[in-house]
Structures are given as structure tokens and as C-alpha cells.
Amino acid sequence: MYAIIKTGGKQVKVEVGQAIYVEKLNVEAGEKVVFDEVILVGGESTKVGAPTVAGATVEGTVEKHGKQKKVVTFQYKPKKHSHRKQGHRQPYTKVMIEAINA
């Protein structure tokens, strides 16, 4: 059984026992998290929501928080001795999926 959930402005396909990386959630490591915005539940029979599947939830446990690899942006203006270098590390949350309730 699998499901497609919406979290952090993105859609993610999940299965039980899978670890996913999502945008940072305001939940401590080790706590349970429930995703209510389930767009599709698949398996023997597929349920498609309009826009979400009524009563369907996905449960998981937060394993850790962290930051992704640095993305470097560099801008310059030729012949003007003007340049700017900037780095960014996006925070994420690692979630282990435990149950899909449909």
C-alpha cells in the first residue's frame, strides 16, 4: 500500500517503512507526526481525493533534523569589479513512515 501526501508545498509518494526527507517541521525528534493531506491512496483499490481523501491519514515518527548540502550562488558584473557570493543550506526533517490509514 502506498499514498501520496502533501507537505511543505510538495507532493511525496510514501510507503510503510520508508524514510522521507521533508521541509522542516516544528516537531521534536522522536515524536509522532500525522499527515492529514492525503491526495491518493493506492494498493488493491485506488482512492483518489478531490482534493484530498476523506478520513485518510499517514503516521510517522520524526528521526532527526538537519541541513542539506550548501548551494552556492555567485553573481557578477563583467568589467565592473563587482561580484557577490552567497551560500544557503535548506533545513529538513527526516520522517520514518509507520502507518497508512485509509
Swiss-Prot record:
InterPro entries: bL21-like, bL21-like_sf, Ribosomal_bL21. GO terms for cellular component: cytoplasm; ribonucleoprotein complex; ribosome. It comes from Enterococcus faecalis (strain ATCC 700802 / V583). This is Large ribosomal subunit protein bL21. One of its GO terms (molecular function) is rRNA binding. It comes from the Bacteria. This protein binds to 23S rRNA in the presence of protein L20. The keyword Cell wall biogenesis/degradation does not apply. Belongs to the bacterial ribosomal protein bL21 family.
